[in-house]
Amino acid sequence: WIMGHMVNAIWQIDQFMDLGVNSIEFDINFDKSANPIYTYHGVPCDCFRSCLKWEYFGDFLTALRHRTTPGDKLYKEKLILFVFDMKTNSLYDNQAYTAGVNMANNIFKYYWNNGNNGGRSYFILSIPNLNHYNLIKGFQETIKSKGHPELLEKVGYDFSANDDIPDVEKAYQKVGVTGHVWQSDGITNCLPRTLTRVQAAVKERDSGGVINKVYYWTADKYSTTRDALDAGVDGIMTNYPYVLNDVLKENAYKNKFRLANYEDNPWVTFKP
């Protein structure tokens, strides 16, 4: 999965698709009542990027629906995975459940078209705080209450704060999550980071733990990209998708890796 990083404006969805991604990540900001209001990163953000692009959340979800509904004139067949990078650190811990309810209501209405032939993409709810595990519960219970539990087959989870893996697993246990788990690891492209924790996450994935997939962010250099692939990640988030596409054509990688497509279940751990 090539994950386009910080795609917060509608026009950037098409820009990143043209650059060769099959997945995009965007930032969700909440108001004081835990309502998701707009896609926006703000300052500081990655080096060499503009941090100030934004859209209203409902408009952005509608744009995503058009691009992932077969038969729509804006349809992009290769766009198969989203990462909702939810900026919940602005909320109190006891608002996490409400944030999950509000995320579910918005996604159900604007992306899933109220359960009527909505967008087909899979997506990851990425949470930056282990104490906000109840967001998952709020999301799941809201979708079930609408009579559409099958839509949860399209939803996965990630805690994105680089916490210790056992602590991450405990947070999932509290809300009964046993699958659909991606583990992220990384840092802004301005700073170097070792792959020690990525390797720990990959080991946990391959030992049959709760983690199904691992992604690394933000890899913009050829060397970092190769190191992440060598560590065995399933996805790489990048500002420059051509770098990863170039590396995947190199002799060392072209027979080991390929771009994921819609038939590849993002919740199933890959077994070579």
Curated annotation (Swiss-Prot):
It catalyses: an N-(acyl)-sphingosylphosphocholine = an N-(acyl)-sphingosyl-1,3-cyclic phosphate + choline; an N-(acyl)-sphingosylphosphoethanolamine = an N-(acyl)-sphingosyl-1,3-cyclic phosphate + ethanolamine; a 1-acyl-sn-glycero-3-phosphocholine = a 1-acyl-sn-glycero-2,3-cyclic phosphate + choline; a 1-acyl-sn-glycero-3-phosphoethanolamine = a 1-acyl-sn-glycero-2,3-cyclic phosphate + ethanolamine. Binds 1 Mg(2+) ion per subunit. Its main location: secreted. GO terms for biological process: killing of cells of another organism; lipid catabolic process. GO terms for cellular component: extracellular region. It is an enzyme of class 4 (lyase). It is found in: Secreted. It comes from the Eukaryota. Mg(2+) binds at residues 25, 27, 85. The active site is at 5, 41 (nucleophile). Expressed by the venom gland. InterPro entries: PLC-like_Pdiesterase_TIM-brl (IPR017946). Its EC number is 4.6.1.-. Dermonecrotic toxins cleave the phosphodiester linkage between the phosphate and headgroup of certain phospholipids (sphingolipid and lysolipid substrates), forming an alcohol (often choline) and a cyclic phosphate. This toxin acts on sphingomyelin (SM). It may also act on ceramide phosphoethanolamine (CPE), lysophosphatidylcholine (LPC) and lysophosphatidylethanolamine (LPE), but not on lysophosphatidylserine (LPS), and lysophosphatidylglycerol (LPG). It acts by transphosphatidylation, releasing exclusively cyclic phosphate products as second products. This is Dermonecrotic toxin LspaSicTox-alphaII1. It comes from Loxosceles spadicea (Recluse spider).
